[in-house]
Amino acid sequence: MNLKEHIRVIENFPKEGISFKDVTTILQDGKVLNYTIDKLAENLKDKKIDKIVGPEARGFLFGTPLAYKLGVGFVPVRKKGKLPYETISCKYDLEYGQDELQIHKDSIKKGDKVAIVDDLLATGGTIASVVKLVEELGGEVVNVSFVIELTDLKGKDKLEGYDINSLVQYNI
């Protein structure tokens, strides 16, 4: 299956000059969603993963079914103030300003082998923050997987030294 054929591209969204890659078309088609999760799982089958971690919000959409498929737990990473228990935080830069991500303190145990999953790799700032959170809790990031990678934005540069997979690549 050519997954790229199932990703809707919307030009000039959310603002002029942006070519938005819409993954909701993957989610709407059961066969395409199953294929996507199977391909993500294939990349992890020999990694002995303990947990899947996914950032808000679209990381939840692919991370949770992937965790189910692999028979492991899923850990959400959310924006500040959205998790109910004790958390640790990591700030990261946005185009204009900063944002902050949080993870529950008890969600990753020392030595847990963790795969991080998200829908899209752009500049890498969000995922670099997720990596920091996992490692601060003592987890070992053994893989970082994406459905889509925007190669021209060089997000992999912020993740140097980590095993990275993406199912579809776009040059923007």
UniProtKB/Swiss-Prot annotation:
Protein's name in the database: Adenine phosphoribosyltransferase
Pfam family, one: Pribosyltran
Transmembrane segments annotated in the record for this chain: none
GO cellular component: cytoplasm
Keyword vocabulary terms for this entry: Cytoplasm, Glycosyltransferase, Purine salvage, Transferase
An example Gene Ontology molecular-function term: adenine binding
Catalytic reaction list: AMP + diphosphate = 5-phospho-alpha-D-ribose 1-diphosphate + adenine
Keyword Acetylation: no
Family annotation (HAMAP family): Aden_phosphoribosyltr (MF_00004)
GO BP term, pick one: adenine salvage
Its EC number(s): 2.4.2.7
Organism of this sequence: Clostridium botulinum (strain Hall / ATCC 3502 / NCTC 13319 / Type A)
Oligomeric form and interacting partners: Homodimer.
Family: Belongs to the purine/pyrimidine phosphoribosyltransferase family.
Gene: apt
